[in-house]
Each structure stands twice: as structure tokens, then as C-alpha cells.
Swiss-Prot record:
Keywords: Metal-binding, Zinc. It comes from the Bacteria. SUPFAM superfamilies: Glucocorticoid receptor-like (DNA-binding domain) (SSF57716). Residues 45-65 are annotated as: Disordered. Belongs to the DNA gyrase inhibitor YacG family. One of its GO terms (molecular function) is DNA topoisomerase type II (double strand cut, ATP-hydrolyzing) inhibitor activity. GO terms for biological process: regulation of DNA-templated transcription. Zn(2+) binds at residues 9, 12, 28, 32. The lineage of its organism: Bacteria, Pseudomonadati, Pseudomonadota, Gammaproteobacteria, Enterobacterales. This is DNA gyrase inhibitor YacG. Its cofactor is Zn(2+). Residues 54-65 have a biased composition (Acidic residues). Binds 1 zinc ion. It comes from Escherichia coli (strain K12). The gene is yacG.
Length: 65
């Protein structure tokens, strides 16, 4: 028999069963899922990078010839 895997909701910390019975996994609810999405949309969360490439001289919208 397989062991039940549980994780903590990243928003509120409640225990969530990792399986089809938890449609919002890893979140415990649609509310927690939307809170997390809002944090990403408001740029409160981000994936760390080694530097700011947006100001790089290597970026150009003109094709190289």
C-alpha cells in the first residue's frame, strides 16, 4: 500500500494531501492559490538571478547583420 504524502500550503501552512483529492495542491484552497498568484503579479515574489540582464548592451531588438 502506498504511503500518503503531505505537504504544507506555501501560503498558510496547513497540511495538504498530495494527490487527486487536493485539486489546488500544493495550496490548500483556491483562496491560497490566488493569494500566491497576486504576490507574483505584484512582483512581491521573483526568481533570483545572478544579475540584471535587462540593462545589458548585448540585448537588441535589431537583428544582427
Amino acid at each position: 500500500m502506498s504511503e500518503t504524502i503531505t505537504v504544507n500550503c506555501p501560503t498558510c501552512g496547513k497540511t495538504v494531501v498530495w494527490g487527486e483529492i487536493s485539486p489546488f495542491r500544493p495550496f490548500c484552497s483556491k483562496r491560497c492559490q490566488l493569494i500566491d498568484l497576486g504576490e507574483w503579479a505584484a512582483e512581491e515574489k521573483r526568481i533570483p538571478s545572478s544579475g540584471d540582464l535587462s540593462e545589458s548592451d548585448d540585448w537588441s531588438e535589431e537583428p544582427k547583420q
